[in-house]
A protein has these predicted regions:
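Residues that define the transmembrane beta-barrel architecture of outer-membrane proteins
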Residues: 28-32, 42-46, 68, 89-97, ...
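Extracellular loop and loop/strand-boundary signature of outer-membrane beta-barrel proteins
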Residues: 33-36, 79-88, 144-150, 197-203
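Predominantly the C-terminal beta-signal and adjacent terminal strand-loop region
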Residues: 160-219
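N-terminal targeting signals for Sec/Tat export/insertion, comprising classic cleavable signal peptides
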Residues: 33-56
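Extended low-complexity acidic/polar segments
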Residues: 131-176
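Cleavable N-terminal export/targeting peptides
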Residues: 1-29, 219
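Solvent-exposed, glycine/polar-rich loop segments of beta-barrel outer-membrane systems
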Residues: 21, 134-148, 188-198
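Gram-negative (and chloroplast) outer-membrane scaffold detector with strong preference
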Residues: 49-141, 208-219
């Protein structure tokens, strides 16, 4: 966690506790949302989330979803073999426990109101990965396939979102920034085929970051 992240959480958490001590209980304690993220490392992510608000400004919950590369960045290959084209782009499914820390209303527009929020969490991917390798003859024609799999490598990562939400009655939307500690090649780096470690073909680890949009319903 970087310093900015900790400062934002401390600030909003302090506001939340102060405001909660002076606010009336809300009947809208549950929030469901559909979320879409576009990240660096050429990846997109979609998930569905649920949070239960133990007070108006603190929600506990999580999400389930998947992420995938939309453009391959490094393709393991060698003499007489290459990773099958259907497995060039890295992907995985995940569950994502998280805490939603929401500020009191910071501005209003008609019947709608704006809030700031921070949402720290941990992404837990399926701790298993497999790919098919295409076997080639001297002319580059396919002569068969072999499966390579592993359960080694880091399959989890901490992340956080910082954003702005607009709520009208029970409906709303959010936009903001997301930062993750996920290494999208974390599992594949440990794969070996024909004596060659896949890690040599992938770029150095970079923490993905980008933007997100969410549509939610309160009840």
């Amino acid at each position: 966690m970087n310093r900015m992240y900790l400062l934002c959480i401390t600030f909003i958490l302090g506001i939340a506790f102060f405001a909660n001590a002076q606010s009336k209980p809300s009947e809208l304690k549950r929030k469901i949302a559909l979320n879409g993220e576009l990240l660096s490392c050429d990846t997109w992510q979609v998930d569905a989330s649920f949070h239960y608000f133990v007070c108006p400004y603190i929600g506990l919950g999580g999400s389930i979803g998947m992420w995938k590369q939309y453009m391959a960045d490094g393709i393991p290959s060698g003499r007489g073999w290459t990773v099958d084209e259907d497995h060039e782009n890295v992907e995985n499914f995940f569950i994502h426990p998280s805490i939603s820390l929401v500020s009191p209303c910071i501005a209003k527009i008609g019947e709608g109101h704006f809030n700031l929020f921070v949402e720290p969490g941990i992404m837990m991917n399926i701790p298993y990965c497999n790919v098919f390798v295409t076997l080639l003859d001297d002319r580059g024609s396919t002569i068969g396939y072999k499966k390579v799999s592993t359960n080694k490598g880091r399959w989890y990562a901490f992340d956080y979102k910082i954003g702005l939400s607009l709520t009208y009655d029970q409906f709303g939307c959010s936009i903001g920034y997301i930062h993750s500690g996920l290494d999208i090649f974390g599992m594949r780096r440990n794969m070996i085929f024909d004596g060659k470690l896949f890690n040599a073909y992938y770029p150095e680890r970079k923490n993905p970051h980008g933007c997100f949009v969410s549509f939610f319903y309160l009840f």
